[in-house]
Structures are given as C-alpha cells and as structure tokens.
Design a protein with these regions (language model features):
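Loop/turn-rich, solvent-exposed surfaces of beta-rich toroidal or solenoidal domains
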Residues: 273-280, 288-322
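C-terminal motif of bacterial Sec signal peptides marking the signal peptidase cleavage site
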Residues: 12-15
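Short loop/turn segments that connect beta-strands within beta-propeller blades
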Residues: 72-75, 112-115, 150-153, 195-198, ...
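Extracytoplasmic beta-rich repeat domains
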Residues: 20-53, 80-96, 117-133, 156-179, ...
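Blade-level signature of beta-propeller repeat domains, shared across WD40, Kelch, NHL, RCC1
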Residues: 330, 335-367
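Structural signature of WD-repeat beta-propellers
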Residues: 63-64, 103-104, 141-142, 185-187, ...
Length: 367
C-alpha cells in the first residue's frame, strides 16, 4: 500500500530539525514600471492546490467551499457561477466550456457554464486539478492512478495504474496536454500517454532522486508544468528542474536544485525558487544559469509567472513582486490582503490575476 506525505508534514519535519529563518525584510524600492490594481473579488477561501485557468478573456477559479466561477478578465464581471455541492480537494480544470473540480468526498464534478452535468466517484484522494481537453476529463489521484472520463456523460473510458513508489506526495502534480498526447507525472518521470486508450507512449526522468530514505528520495513532479513549444519543463520535488522535448521524448536539460513550488517561464527563460526562496533563472534552450536573486529568501514564494520584461511572484504576506527578467531586480511591488498568495499568478490579455489563501482575487495591470 502506498503512503502519502503532504507539504505540511514535510514542513513540520524541517521545523523540528532547525528553525526556519525569518523572511528577508523587504527592501525599499523606487518603482521602475507602472502598475495598479484594476479590480478585486472574493471567494470563500482558495481551493487546495488551486490552478487558475485563463481562456478567451475569462478567469475561472474555485473556492474551498465548492464554488466555481468565471470572471471577465478586463473588469472582473461575473460571467457564471456554480457549486460542486461539497468542499474541494483540487481544482480547477477548464476548456472554456466545461470546468472540473474534485471534492473531499472523492468525486470529480463537471460543470458547464455553472450547471453541474455529472459526478463520478474516485477510488483515491486527488490533489491535482483535473485536465479538461478533447471532450475528455483526466484525473490523477495522489496514488498516481490516472482516470479518463467522457466530458459529455461522465463515462469512465480508461484507467492507467502502474507500479510505483511506496511513498507519494500529496501536492498538485503534472497533468497536461501536448498536441495529441496526455502528459502526466509518475514520480520524477514525465510520462506520455495515448489519451484515447490510456497506453504509455514514452517516459523520461526529469531528475535523479537522491537520499538515504523514502522521504529524501521523494521526487514527484510538481505542477503545473511549463510548456515552451515542443519542450515541457517541470520541477521534481526537492530534487531538480528539468525540460524534455515532448515531441521526441528526449531530455533537453536537467539541473539539481531543491524546491517545492512549480516553475514558470517563456521561450527564453525558465524561473523558479528553491526551498529557501532563492530565485534562479535558466536559459530555456540550454539550462545555463542566467541569474540568481536572494532578495526574497524565506518569504514563502508562489510559483512564478513570466510575462513581458517581468517575473512575477507572490509571497506569504500577500505581496506581489514584479522582478526584472534580465537580472532579478525588483521593478514594482503591490499588496493584496496580507494572506499568502496560493497559486501562480495567471494572465489573460494584459490583466494579471493573483489569488490569496483568504479567497481574495486581485487583478493587476502593469502599464
């Protein structure tokens, strides 16, 4: 039987071994770019492992209480709202028409423009947001079992279950679409699956686990993954960051660097923070180190968003940091509600949405 380990337990283990240093005080800055909050909204606390989806000028988000809503990105106007009928364990996946979440009762729930269309019982807990793509809904449990459902009627199409490690991570993993292929994280391996049949096409390790016990060797890929054309990159929990050519099924590069949050980037740069919140930026094509920054160490950084000339992180005090992609220097800092930023900032058009643990939705627009 597989056992699960959550981030809270790992944090407790770390705290028992040594006291985590206090967050680095924020340095005084002179804003180098203009930016402002353009609208805000609120949900009843962010859903665990929340992934904000941005599509066709809309943000789709989910609250811990089961609420699911879509908002216009430019002005925050509510487009539709629904409810899964129970508190959530993971969300949200959306293709613009359908939205899927998973409840604490181990049910995947599909909504269409706010109306519940179907529910399906799952055999295990889920901490990764479902993927909705190609008229299918893909759900991966914390036991790494992958189920595919028909988006129209909830019919189970196939199940992928493979031998795995005795210990798995209860944290959002990788479930992503690449052309006609489903990509899922299986431990430290990026695995390509036929979305029609559930058969494995190829897999490749993005990192090499180290350590002398099960906890130290824990190396599940943490999501969401980063797609850069034919290349897909992801963090391997506490072990490294790697990129693979998903068209060829080959490793492009891998770097040993600790960390627990997902990475961000674009065609030129891949960015992530390690376990101490030291930020590193690598050249996307080669993996060569471009720069590092220690100005935000121990501030509990979110996964980043790279857009334009900026790298955007949220922190545990609700601050949103806009860093210069050239060298990591702070260009702008904007506040939210003081609670931790819990998901990577999301972009729709020229609007950036940040979600906090207390359920605050804050839309910013760099100018």
């Amino acid at each position: 039987m597989r056992r699960l380990i959550g981030l809270s337990l790992l944090a407790l283990l770390a705290a028992c071994s040594s006291d985590r240093p206090k967050p680095t005080p924020l340095e005084a800055i002179t804003p180098q770019i203009a930016g402002r909050q353009v609208w805000s909204a609120r949900i009843d606390g962010a859903a665990p492992g929340l992934i904000v989806t941005a599509r066709d000028g809309e943000f789709t988000v989910a609250g811990a209480d089961g609420s699911v809503l879509a908002l216009q990105s430019d002005n925050g106007r509510e487009v539709w709202r629904g409810n899964a009928g129970a508190r959530l364990s993971a969300g949200i996946g959306s293709d613009g028409r359908h939205a899927a979440v998973v409840t604490r009762d181990n049910e995947v729930v599909l909504l269409e423009r706010g109306a519940v269309k179907w529910r399906a019982r799952l055999a295990s807990r889920v901490s990764t947001a479902p993927l909705v793509a190609g008229e299918r809904v893909f759900v991966m449990g914390v036991d790494r079992v992958v189920n595919a459902y028909d988006a129209l009627d909830g019919r189970l199409l196939w199940t992928l279950q493979r031998p795995g490690d005795p210990l798995t991570l209860s944290q959002p993993g990788v479930v992503a679409a690449f052309k006609d292929t489903l990509l899922v994280g299986q431990g430290q391996r990026l695995t390509a699956v036929d979305p029609l049949r559930g058969s494995v096409r190829w897999e490749i390790a993005l990192a090499n686990p180290r350590g002398t016990n099960e906890v130290e060797r824990l190396s599940d890929l943490t999501g969401p993954a980063l797609r850069l054309g034919d290349v897909v990159c992801a963090r391997s929990f506490q072990v490294g960051v790697g990129c693979a050519n998903a068209q060829l099924g080959t490793l492009v590069w891998s770097r040993n660097v600790g960390g627990v949050q997902a990475i961000g980037g674009d065609a030129d740069l891949v960015v992530g923070a390690d376990a101490s919140d030291r930020i590193s930026a690598w050249r996307a094509g080669s993996g060569d180190l471009a720069w590092t920054s220690e100005t935000l160490r121990y501030r509990g950084l979110s996964a980043p968003l790279v857009v334009g000339r900026t790298v955007i992180f949220g922190d545990t005090e609700g601050q949103v940091h806009f860093l210069d992609r050239a060298d990591g220097k702070t260009l702008l800092r904007l506040p939210t509600d003081g609670s931790p930023v819990v998901a990577a900032p999301a972009r729709a058009g020229n609007t950036i949405l940040v979600v906090t643990k207390n359920g605050g939705l804050f839309a910013f627009r760099p100018e």
